[in-house]
């Protein structure tokens, strides 16, 4: 009897796996057209935990361009890309789902694939360098995308926070994660001292709550890894230079604009 039950359970598991696999390659698509636009908060959260090298490797194994592979993976795995989800998506599944996305939503698919390709190409380094001194200092990542904020009225946090383990302003260098051009620099009520860098791919990278700046001006070009300033706790005030209303951290965000002159006045902690 126990042996029969085991066979029944095994058969049910096989059927379940086959159904899940088939959902990626045939039948109805697991999303609506709007899901492949920036109106999709899950897409905007950018929960990607793969390095550029890992993404390139998995894309090559599936014989797909980097952007198309990453877009397909995000759709297949509920907008999460990490080693586990990448390894679970087979070459056959990836190609089949990519082809269906192109067939049903070509404009949206290619636009989002271009965005993902741009992000992977842009991001060359982590914005906080590893400490080389005797006193090792590091940071903690806080996935605070979409969390509630109340300063200036109820709103949602649009970005992510890199928190300083040593809660002292002015000691953690902030590096440009990408090459690009300084588009904005100066004080914002919410973001404090901030700087915005626009890459050649048209993506705007926003660094907020700085304690001080490197000698940079609007229009200057920067390279990936170049010093932008130092991490701080500025902001939440119309008075320029206000500090200390929250812990030391870097607010980091990536923005897309249809205008050639990005504005980040709504960016917030």
Spans of model-derived segments:
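Surface-exposed, glycine-biased beta-strand/turn segments
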Residues: 45, 49, 83-193, 224
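Zn2+-dependent peptidoglycan hydrolase active-site motif and core
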Residues: 175-212, 239-248
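A structural signal for short beta-strand/turn segments enriched in small hydrophobics and glycine
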Residues: 180, 219-231
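Short, charged beta-turn/beta-strand-edge "cap" motif at the junction between a beta-strand
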Residues: 188-190, 228-236
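Conserved small/polar residues in nucleotide/adenosyl-binding loops
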Residues: 257-264
């Amino acid at each position: 009897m126990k042996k029969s039950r085991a066979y029944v359970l095994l058969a049910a598991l096989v059927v379940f796996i086959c159904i899940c696999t088939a959902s990626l390659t045939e039948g109805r698509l697991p999303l609506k057209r709007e899901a492949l636009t920036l109106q999709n908060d899950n897409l905007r959260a950018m929960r990607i935990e793969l390095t550029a090298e890992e993404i390139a490797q998995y894309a090559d194994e599936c014989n797909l361009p980097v952007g198309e592979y990453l877009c397909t993976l995000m759709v297949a795995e509920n907008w999460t890309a990490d080693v586990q989800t990448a390894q679970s998506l087979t070459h056959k599944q990836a190609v089949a789902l990519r082809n269906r996305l192109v067939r049903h939503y070509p404009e949206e698919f290619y636009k989002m694939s271009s965005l993902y390709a741009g992000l992977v190409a842009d991001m060359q380094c982590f914005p906080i360098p590893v400490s080389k001194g005797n006193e090792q200092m590091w940071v903690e990542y806080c996935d605070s995308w979409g969390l509630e904020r109340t300063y200036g009225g109820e709103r949602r946090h649009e970005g992510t926070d890199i928190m300083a383990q040593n809660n002292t302003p002015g000691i953690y260098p902030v590096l440009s994660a990408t090459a690009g051009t300084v588009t904005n620099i100066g004080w914002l009520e919410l973001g404090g001292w901030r700087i915005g860098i626009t890459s050649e791919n048209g993506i705007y990278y926003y660094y907020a709550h700085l304690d001080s700046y490197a000698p940079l001006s609007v229009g200057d070009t920067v390279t990936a890894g170049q010093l932008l300033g130092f991490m701080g706790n500025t902001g939440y005030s119309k008075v320029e230079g206000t500090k200390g209303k929250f812990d030391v951290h870097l607010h980091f965000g990536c923005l897309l604009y249809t205008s050639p002159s990005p504005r980040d006045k709504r960016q917030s902690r």
